[in-house]
Design a protein with these regions (language model features):
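Extended amphipathic alpha-helical scaffold segments
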Residues: 15, 39-276
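General structural signal for secondary-structure boundaries
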Residues: 1, 24-27, 91-93
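Short amphipathic alpha-helical interaction segments
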Residues: 1-9
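Short capping/hinge segments at domain boundaries that bridge a core fold to an adjacent linker or tail
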Residues: 13-48
Length: 276
């Protein structure tokens, strides 16, 4: 129903029988019109656009990200604003990053990545998106714990993370770019911590984590195996958190470790013991 939708999207807050707007929508509309007008007036001279909006001061970055996120809903807006602001060589790198942050923090960026996924790959920008998700696609909550210093809890947000996971898996980029393994593992581990996981995305993330564990095990046959613990611990944590999608693989994995511990050589025994 409408009330549930507004609550789930964070538009309203409820207290007992009363509801209120969670933020000033009129303020958002004013900024939306301001950015739209500045963009139209620049007529493709993007430096003019950014020089204009920078007059807002430091608040401009979050407002710009929100403006970008709001362009996700309609294809006309995605074509008019997001294509040029993502791919044009005339965009300053600092602002291109803000554009990417606005995209990945949006809950509605699925269509964008479906439409522009191939272009992102061709332009070599995929891991720019991965790094920005890993750094910025979070929501902070300050926790006050009795007689202790306040702590910040970071929760993954936005739909950029699952969209990129699908792209990495479908194009098998996780196999081709082993050098980027740490960033991909963090991406999947953060997704595993989300409450609103989707089975097909979780399955893709698990497949990549399983591949990296098996890859590290093969590597350890030729190299000093002690580093394998650091390499696979985050992968295994992600798999534990998504056990509904990795249960059979985990059973097989630990059965293999047990067998190696019982029947293997000294190196296999020590490696299996350390992993367990």
């Amino acid at each position: 129903d409408i009330m549930h939708a507004l609550l789930s999207e964070g538009v309203i807050a409820q207290q007992g029988d009363y509801i209120r707007l969670k933020y000033d929508i009129f303020e958002d509309i004013c900024f939306e019109h301001y950015f739209d007008k500045a963009f139209d007036l620049c007529k493709g001279k993007y430096k003019t656009f950014y020089d204009e909006i920078e007059n807002l001061g430091r608040c401009v970055y979050r407002r710009y990200q929100i403006w970008i996120s709001n362009k996700m809903f309609i294809q006309v807006n995605r074509d008019k604003f997001l294509y040029s602001l993502t791919f044009s060589d005339e965009i300053p790198q600092s602002w291109k990053r803000q554009t990417e942050i606005g995209i990945v923090k949006s809950r509605f960026c699925d269509n964008y990545f479906e439409e522009q996924g191939s272009e992102i790959l061709e332009q070599g920008m995929l891991f720019d998106f991965v790094k920005n998700i890993n750094l910025f696609a979070f929501e902070g909550e300050l926790l006050h714990i009795r007689q202790e210093s306040p702590q910040m809890k970071l929760s993954p947000i936005g739909n950029g993370r699952p969209c990129i996971i699908r792209l990495l898996k479908n194009e098998e980029i996780y196999k081709k770019n082993i050098i980027e393994r740490d960033d991909i593992v963090k991406l999947c581990l953060d997704y595993a911590k989300q409450e609103d996981k989707v089975a097909v995305i979780a399955s893709d993330a698990c497949a990549m984590m399983e591949y990296y564990v098996e890859y590290s095990l093969q590597e350890s046959e030729q190299e000093n195996y002690y580093k394998i613990i650091d390499e696979i611990s985050s992968c295994l944590e992600a798999l534990y958190r998504m056990a509904d999608n990795s249960e059979e693989w985990l059973k097989k994995f630990f059965n293999t470790l047990i067998n190696n511990y019982i029947n293997g050589n000294r190196k296999s025994m020590r490696k299996s013991e350390d992993i367990v």
